[in-house]
From Swiss-Prot:
Lineage of the species this protein comes from: Eukaryota, Fungi, Dikarya, Ascomycota, Pezizomycotina
Spans through the membrane: none
Source species of the chain: Emericella nidulans (strain FGSC A4 / ATCC 38163 / CBS 112.46 / NRRL 194 / M139) (Aspergillus nidulans)
Keyword Membrane: yes
SMART domains, per the entry: RAB, RAN, RAS, RHO
GO molecular function: G protein activity; GDP binding; GTP binding; GTPase activity
Pfam families tied to this protein: Ras
Activity regulation as described: Alternates between an inactive form bound to GDP and an active form bound to GTP. Activated by a guanine nucleotide-exchange factor (GEF) and inactivated by a GTPase-activating protein (GAP).
Family, per entry: Belongs to the small GTPase superfamily. Ras family.
Gene from which this protein is expressed: rasA
Residue stretch(es) of the prosequence: 210-212
Descriptive protein name: Ras-like protein
Modified residues (Cysteine methyl ester): C209
């Protein structure tokens, strides 16, 4: 029986230009793939889901990846509760930019750890891959966060990425509300790798969604 309490989660999708942030977001919200590349300045989407028997209202902010919009980043970083750090497995530069985004988030939040998931997108383009899965796992391990590879085009692990970020936020909030428990959050890294499901599947997901 799902809880009737509606909790809103402010999720922010961050990454360089052209890595597929909008495609991931629209695939989650509207269940279709956008072929054309139209650089985003800032778009916000809302969707109601049930994740692990708890109702969640996802407020997803799709952000600009272009450098000329970098001044806007700190504003949405202040309000975000969790971040998907997205790079393309076909772009070494986009992978290297992830470190900068992560450091900026921690600086703005003034935290040593904050709910983040590293996302290697476009895993359907394996023949064009220039960033190995092991490199993504290693970076996530360095951050003390989870790692997942996705494909917006093939709908691989799209829901998993967003749902697991909600789970990380819940875990983080629980840890912060109980500081006398197991110690400082982030002392142990979560499992850094999640299984990549087949197209159309939602491995590990316990949820259903309603577009708002």
């Amino acid at each position: 029986m799902a809880s009737k309490f509606l909790r809103e989660y402010k999720l922010v999708v961050v990454g360089g230009g052209g890595v597929g942030k909008s495609c991931l977001t629209i695939q989650l919200i509207q269940s279709h793939f956008v072929d054309e590349y139209d650089p985003t300045i800032e778009d916000s989407y809302r969707k109601q889901c049930v994740i692990d028997d708890e109702v969640a209202l996802l407020d997803v902010l799709d952000t600009a990846g272009q450098e000329e919009y970098s001044a806007m980043r700190e504003q949405y970083m202040r309000t975000g509760e969790g971040f998907l750090l997205v790079y393309s497995i076909t772009s070494r530069q986009s992978f290297e930019e992830i470190m900068t985004f992560q450091q900026q988030i921690l600086r703005v939040k003034d935290k040593d750890y904050f709910p983040i998931i590293v996302v290697g997108n476009k895993c359907d383009l394996d023949k064009e891959r220039v960033v190995s899965e092991q490199e993504g796992e290693s970076l996530a391990r360095q951050f003390g966060c989870k790692f997942i590879e996705t494909s917006a085009k093939s709908r691989i692990n799209v829901e998993n990425a967003f749902y697991d970020l909600v789970r990380e936020i819940r875990r983080y909030n629980k840890e912060m509300s109980n500081p006398s428990g197991s110690g400082a959050f982030g002392a142990r890294a979560p499992d850094s790798k999640m299984d990549v499901s087949e197209p159309g599947e939602s491995a590990g997901c316990c949820g259903k969604c309603i577009v708002m």
